[in-house]
């Protein structure tokens, strides 16, 4: 499969949590990051062709997904959303800041898609009921997105991990414990369940940026 080079990037607590509780905005935990950590995050954004989050992240966090703490271009924003249920006032639909692609399915209401297009976003249909990432990734590659930063959340991260179509994972470690059984972690989904199916990583680099430990991992058993 021709696909972009994929980098999952996230802040995580020591116990691997992304938020304080299910349904909470990740911006609360991210408020613990210092400016150097934000610079690190935005330096990656400035180097990639595209950036992706799920529509639940858009609804909860309303991110802009632009480059502000570093110099460089804004990446193309890609939002997979089976029903195209992205709020029409979402920051990602402000296409004056950066281009946006909404990846959706045949079941998305046509009138909804027209409203999104009127705001300047591009719509691509890849799938019947659910967004088909096996179709989406080659389509993004054909559109010139050779490198893709995935900022989650847990469900989107699982779509890449379970298909083994992720090349790197970069983590900003926050020195806190969140706890909780149902709090989203770095990767959601049903899990691999068997030892032989696990995704294997190799530590490529680790360093301190500001007050945060950064780890950068290379995926060993990926599929290109």
Swiss-Prot record:
Keyword NADP: yes
UniProt pathway: Cofactor biosynthesis; riboflavin biosynthesis
Documented EC number(s): 1.1.1.302
Binding locations of NADP(+): 57, 61, 82-85, 131, 153-156
EC top class, as a word: oxidoreductase
BP terms from Gene Ontology: riboflavin biosynthetic process
Catalytic activity of the protein: 2,5-diamino-6-(1-D-ribitylamino)pyrimidin-4(3H)-one 5'-phosphate + NADP(+) = 2,5-diamino-6-(1-D-ribosylamino)pyrimidin-4(3H)-one 5'-phosphate + NADPH + H(+); 2,5-diamino-6-(1-D-ribitylamino)pyrimidin-4(3H)-one 5'-phosphate + NAD(+) = 2,5-diamino-6-(1-D-ribosylamino)pyrimidin-4(3H)-one 5'-phosphate + NADH + H(+)
Entry GO MF terms: 5-amino-6-(5-phosphoribosylamino)uracil reductase activity; NADP binding; oxidoreductase activity, acting on the CH-OH group of donors, NAD or NADP as acceptor; protein dimerization activity
Protein family according to the UniProt entry: Belongs to the HTP reductase family.
Functional note: Catalyzes an early step in riboflavin biosynthesis, the NADPH-dependent reduction of the ribose side chain of 2,5-diamino-6-ribosylamino-4(3H)-pyrimidinone 5'-phosphate, yielding 2,5-diamino-6-ribitylamino-4(3H)-pyrimidinone 5'-phosphate.
Subunit structure: Homodimer.
Protein name: 2,5-diamino-6-ribosylamino-4(3H)-pyrimidinone 5'-phosphate reductase
Biological classification of the source: Bacteria, Pseudomonadati, Aquificota, Aquificia, Aquificales
Gene: ribD2
């Amino acid at each position: 499969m021709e696909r972009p080079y994929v980098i999952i990037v996230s802040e995580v607590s020591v116990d691997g949590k992304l938020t304080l509780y299910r349904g909470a905005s990740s911006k609360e935990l991210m408020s613990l990051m210092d400016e150097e950590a934000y610079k690190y995050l935005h330096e990656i954004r400035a180097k990639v062709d595209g950036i992706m989050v799920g529509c639940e992240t858009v609804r909860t966090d309303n991110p802009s997904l632009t480059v502000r703490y570093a110099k460089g271009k804004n990446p193309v924003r890609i939002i997979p959303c089976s029903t195209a249920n992205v709020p029409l006032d979402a920051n990602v639909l402000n296409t004056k800041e950066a281009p946006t692609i909404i990846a959706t399915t045949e079941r998305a209401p046509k009138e909804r898609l027209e409203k999104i297009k009127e705001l300047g976003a591009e719509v691509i249909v890849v799938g019947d009921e659910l967004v088909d990432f096996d179709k989406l990734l080659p389509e993004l590659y054909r559109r010139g997105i050779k490198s893709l930063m995935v900022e989650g959340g847990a469900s989107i991260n699982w779509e890449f991990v379970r298909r083994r179509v992720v090349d790197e994972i970069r983590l900003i470690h926050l020195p806190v414990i969140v706890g909780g059984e149902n709090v989203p972690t770095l990767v959601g989904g049903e899990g691999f369940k068997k030892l032989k199916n696990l995704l294997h990583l190799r530590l490529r680099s680790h360093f301190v940026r500001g007050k945060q430990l950064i780890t950068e991992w290379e995926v060993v058993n990926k599929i290109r």
